[in-house]
Structures are given as C-alpha cells and as structure tokens.
Amino acid sequence: NISNLITHMARGNTALSISMTGVSSLLAIVTTPLNILFWAALNPDTNALLRQVSIEPLSFLGSTMAILGIPMVLGLATVHYWPRLGHLLRRPLQIMSFLFLVAFIGGAIFTNARYLTVFVQSILPFVVLHNAIAIGLGWGTAKVLRLSDYDTRAMTIEVSMHNSGLGLALILNQFDGLGGAALVAAGWGVWHLISGWALAAWWKRRDPHPQGGSQVARTDTAE
C-alpha cells in the first residue's frame, strides 16, 4: 500500500502502518459498500442515482471482496506458507502496484478531462480540507495517546491517506464512472500523493524521538 511506502520514507513505524492498513482493509470490505448505500439513500438526489444505476448490495459487497479481500488473502497466505517467496515478491509488487495506481489515476483523469475545471473549482478545496482534517486527527489522536514519534508518523499517514484505487475500481465497476465520479476519486488520489510526499519529505529530515507513553514494535526505519 502507498501509505506504507510513505511511512517508510517518513522514517515512521512501518510495522504499525502495515498493521493499520490490514485492519482497515478488512473492515473496508464490509463498511465501504454499507456506508455508500446507507448515506446515499438519505439524500433524495443520490438515492435516485442509486436506483438509476441499479446498485445491488450483494453485488457491491462482492465487488469490494474481489478487489480487496482476495488479494489480501493471497498475500497473507503467501507470506505465511512461503515466506521466502513473499519476501522476494514484496518489492516488485510494491513497484508494480504504485505504477498501476498512477496509470489508473492518469487514465481516469484523461477520460473525464471535461470535468476537470469543475473539480478544481468546486471539489478540490474540500479534498484538501478533508485531507488536512484527517492529518490533524491522526496526529492529534497519536499525541493524546502519548505515542512515540515513530508511531505518530505512521498513524498520521494512515489516517490521512485513503485507498483511491478501491474508490476508482468501485466507481468504474458499479457506477460506470457516472457524473465524473472517477475524476473525483482520481483527484483525491493525486492530492493524497502530494500531501503524503510532502509529509515524508518534512519528517525524513528530522530524527524521530523515541519518547512517548507507548510504542508499538517497529521495523528498522533506517534501512
């Protein structure tokens, strides 16, 4: 996951980052379709949109399971039963997934270029605000819990970066890219990359202080 790479670059607790990604991804298999269907049904406009595109809850859940659940199970099984193979494949798959995400986002932006002006003027400010709030929430929660700098960096990045690839896949699969929604998810992904790289660049120049009320076992951040 790109958040794990950003955490590693920021000299944060990569082990905590990976653990949080795993837990949130497992929860997202169920919570993502349920949240979309629940909140969209509360608004008359979006409720009509759900009926228009004929969203089936079980189909939505199945798509999320296929996108998130199956790759995760395969990855965990590989690492557990064939650890050497898992270690060998880790870096190539990280590079491939990053390149795929960039290509996926680029394709969505190109296909929905006609909505780009509207996105920049009407939606981008909310994307930036949402991301800033998430950064503050992650950092603030870590401080309240008195976590070390290593853990604070991991939590801040994990809370503030979201799975745009999942969003794009669901939009294209379930909504056919309706109304430029793919551009919204793609733009979200671009901004998260920008803010994530900025955080990593800031923290990379500063040694993390180990002091804190709690510190989760971490991997070597100096590798």
Tell where the protein language model's regions lie, with residue ranges:
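Alpha-helical transmembrane segments of multi-pass small-molecule/ion transporters
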Residues: 1-223
